[in-house]
Amino acid sequence: LPLECKPFSVGFRAEHLQSDIEQSLYHGAAGHPALPRGEYQLSQHVRDGRCVYTFCMCPGGTVCAAASEAGGVVTNGMSLHARDGRNANAAVVVSVDGRDFDGDPAKAVAFQRRLEQAAFRAGGGDYRAPAETVGSFLAGGGKLDLGRVQPTYPRGVTPCDLGGLLPGELSAA
């Protein structure tokens, strides 16, 4: 049975206040009970044919642990039925494909495993997630000045330069 390298994406979860999303979308009507919870989708095609996009936006949701192997950190998001949590979150990801692994599926799996293990180490080796603000990531900083947004990840977070976890071409995208 042939095994082929399938495109996938890697990245991070961004958390922000649900009220900020709704203010941006609904302006003066934000918070009106007749309006749905605010959602968004962003995408941008960048160099080398890659795409950076948001995925699985969770209004009023939380960030949860989703690792499938010991010694790895993977995050996912979820919203409960009411979607009434203080924060919203979305995955911000960049596409990777066979050219990143010479078309070798084993190299793709090894790449994913290395990222998950690097996240584990960057989080402190105790299943906390590495974290930084979006502004810091874009500036190449590694700062975690939480301000009004308190992370929902149940194991906690550790300040980290997330750009250093991804290969340069993916982080630069």
Model region roles, listed by residue range:
Residues L1-A173:
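Residues forming the flavin
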